[in-house]
Design a protein with these regions (language model features):
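Membrane-proximal helix-turn-helix segments that form the acceptor-binding/catalytic region
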Residues: 100-102, 148-167
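N-terminal subdomain of nucleotide-sugar transferases
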Residues: 1-61
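An aromatic- and histidine-rich active-site surface loop
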Residues: 19, 91-96, 112-128
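A conserved catalytic-core segment of Leloir-type glycosyltransferases
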Residues: 42-106
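Alpha-helix capping/helix-boundary segments
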Residues: 119-120, 173-175
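Carbohydrate-associated surface elements
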Residues: 173, 187-190
Length: 190
């Protein structure tokens, strides 16, 4: 699950849609292991923040099971593992290959990708998943904080439209954004 925030933020009380989806999946007996991917950095500044908050520091009551120079995997529970990475902004394909490698090492079996983070879409085929779900909580091309990434986001959204098996949207306006495709479903919060 590619998140739009870091597990450490959830551990400190931040709550958002992907946190609630993760908790629902964790409580379902038919769901196996979950690899929660922390917000992947798009800039050097964010990579430094992720390094400090997620690679150096540890989530309370977690166990670090693997640590590298640019990544770390923490075990939160028998079902939930958290992958933190600072490499994505410079080498997204390398970061995605590392995520795939980690899923294999942890014996995840058939992968289902559930992403809240549009920037991974051009690279998600590297993972070899059986099913791809994109959960759109907003149109990020309209956010001022992503103005410098607008072209990249537009390409990512085209990739999502063309390659996601399922697309969930939080608002009816996003149905139009995804061209009212038959694989797009409105799933409001709550």
């Amino acid at each position: 699950m590619f998140n739009m925030s870091n597990y450490s933020e959830w551990d400190e009380g931040v709550s958002n849609r992907n946190f609630h989806v993760l908790k629902q999946l964790e409580n379902r007996p038919e769901i196996g292991k979950i690899l929660a991917i922390d917000y992947l950095p798009l800039t050097f500044k964010r990579a430094l923040r992720n390094y400090k908050e997620d690679l150096v520091l540890n989530v309370e009551n977690s166990k670090t099971i693997k640590r590298g120079i640019t990544s770390k995997v923490s075990k939160i529970s028998d079902k939930v593992y958290v992958y933190s990475d600072v490499n994505f902004f410079m080498r997204p394909n390398v970061a995605m290959k590392e995520i795939r490698k980690m899923a294999l090492e942890l014996n995840f079996g058939d992968l289902v990708v559930w992403s809240f983070f549009p920037f991974v879409a051009p690279h998600w085929d590297i993972l070899g998943q059986k099913l791809t779900i994109f959960d759109a909580v907003d149109n990020w091309t309209l956010h001022s904080s992503y103005a410098k990434q607008k072209k990249r986001l537009e390409q990512a959204y085209e990739n999502i439209k063309n390659s996601a098996d399922l697309i969930f949207v939080v608002s009816k306006n996003l149905l139009n954004f995804f061209d009212d495709q038959p694989n797009v479903y409105w799933v409001p919060n709550g």
